[in-house]
Regions:
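SDR active-site lid
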Residues: 111-113, 117-124
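Structural signal for interior beta-strand "rungs" in well-ordered beta-sheet cores
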Residues: 1-114
Length: 124
């Protein structure tokens, strides 16, 4: 277990839309103690932001998208429904990830990816 009662933080910016059954975990001592969400994000039904994640501004997580711990989602990223982002993964700005995609490695900025192992399809 990562959390052991330490003082940790969860910062959520302005004008975010957080829908039903969304979960956002605070940071952990071993990960810097902070989970941070930027401004103007949309988290659709049952999406999940794990401990120590950094989600920048204008990010959209469609239904049932879990972010693993320590993930970094840069600004203006769209992640399609039922996709999953593995822990310690970075998704570059303006990237688009198709539905049902397994993101197991970093995604470059402006990329369009889809498939079980997030295959680069082109630039956004």
């Amino acid at each position: 277990m990562k959390f052991n009662g330490e003082k940790t933080k969860l910062e959520i910016g302005d004008y975010n839309k957080i829908r039903e059954s969304v979960t956002i975990n605070p940071g952990t001592k071993g990960g810097g103690g902070l989970t941070k969400v930027g401004n103007n994000c949309l988290f659709m039904v049952s999406s999940h932001i794990a401990h120590d994640c950094l989600v920048e501004d204008n990010v959209i997580l469609a239904n049932n998208v879990p972010l693993g711990g320590h993930a970094h989602i840069e600004k203006n990223v769209i992640i399609g429904g039922n996709s999953a982002v593995q822990q310690f993964t970075r998704v570059g700005k303006f990237a688009m990830i198709g539905g049902m995609c397994g993101v197991v490695r970093d995604i470059i900025p402006y990329a369009m990816v889809h498939g079980n192992r997030s295959i680069l399809q082109g630039l956004n």
